[in-house]
Amino acid sequence: MKKSITSLDLNLLLCLQLLMQERSVTKAAKRMNVTPSAVSKSLSKLRTWFDDPLFVNTPLGLTPTPLMVNMEQSLADWMQMSNQLLDKPHHESPRGLKFELAAESPLVMIMFNSLSQQIYQRYPQATIKVRNWDYDSLDAITRGEVDLGFTGRESHPRSRELLSLLPLSIDFEVLFSDLPWVWLREDHPALQEEWNLETFLRYPHISICWEQSDTWALDDVLQEMGRKRNIALSLPGFEQSLFMAAQPNHSLLATAPLYCQRYNQLHQLPLVARPLPFDAAQREKLMVPFTLLWHKRNSHNPKIIWLKETIKTLYSHLS
C-alpha cells in the first residue's frame, strides 16, 4: 500500500541524505549536531517506513542498498528544491544571497576581482564561496552544494573527462577552448636548443594531480607515440606548477593552458611559452573546452542564470 508523506517526519530525509553523503552514522551525526544514537534511531525509522535496510554495514562504512542508490538523485533534487523554497525571500532581495562556485584555478582568479565586484554591485549583501574544482565537484553540484562549476574538460577519445560522459543531470556550456602550452623560465637551457619533441622530453616535468589522477591527455598522446615524460614533481594545480616553473636554479618544465598567460602577467612571472611539439591531429586530442556546468534543476534559477551570463561576458575575450 502506498504510504502518505504526512506519516513521515521530513527531518528524517535530511538525515537520510547526510548518511548517503557521509556513509557513516558518526559523521552524519556530527554534521547534524546530534548524537550517533539519535542518527541510528532515525535510520531505524527510515528502514521501517521504506521497508528496506537502506544501508548495509561493511568494513569501509555504510553501503547503500539498490533502493537507496535508486533514490539518491530524487532525494538530492528534493533537498535542493526545499532549500530554494526556504530561500525564496532571499531571491526577492539581495540580502543573504549566497553564490557557491567550484572552479579551476587560476581560471577563476584571472577575472575574479571583476566578477566579485559585479556580484557585490548587484547584491551588496551577498556572500561568495569558491572551492577548487576537484574529483567530487560534480557530486557537489548534484547535491546542491555548488551553484556553478567552471573548469576544463578533455577531448582525447579515451579520456574520462569528455563532455559526452557528463551525467544526464548536468547541463553545460563551453565558453572557450584552449590548448596546453609549455612554460619555461626565461633563462631555461631548453630555450637555447631547437624546440622539438626530443628537447621537450629531455628535461624534467612538473605535472598536476587532476581529479585524483597524476596523468592526463598529454600523457595519453605521448603513450600512443611510445614516449613518456619524466615527471619529477607533481603539484595540485596549474597555479602552483607555473609558480614553480618560474623559480631559479632548476630545469623543470610546466604544461598549462595558454589562458595562463594572463595569470603570469598579473603576477609578473618570468615565463616563456612554447607550443607542444606535436602535429595537428595530436594537438586536437589535447584541446581543452573550458565549460560552465550546473544541475538541470537550476536551468531556470534567476540567480544562476545571471551568474552564468556575467561569467560569459567576463571571459568572452578568450573565445
UniProtKB/Swiss-Prot annotation:
Keywords: DNA-binding, Transcription, Transcription regulation. Gene3D superfamilies: Periplasmic binding protein-like II (3.40.190.10), Winged helix-like DNA-binding domain superfamily/Winged helix DNA-binding domain (1.10.10.10). Residues 8-65 form the HTH lysR-type domain. The keyword DNA-binding applies. The keyword Aminoacyl-tRNA synthetase does not apply. SUPFAM superfamilies: Periplasmic binding protein-like II, Winged helix' DNA-binding domain. Pfam families: HTH_1 (PF00126), LysR_substrate (PF03466). Residues 25-44 bind DNA. Coiled coil: none annotated. CDD domains: PBP2_Nitroaromatics_like (cd08417). GO terms for molecular function: DNA binding; DNA-binding transcription factor activity. It comes from the Bacteria. PROSITE patterns: HTH_LYSR. Involved in anaerobic NO protection. Belongs to the LysR transcriptional regulatory family. NCBIfam families: PRK10216.1. This is HTH-type transcriptional regulator YidZ.
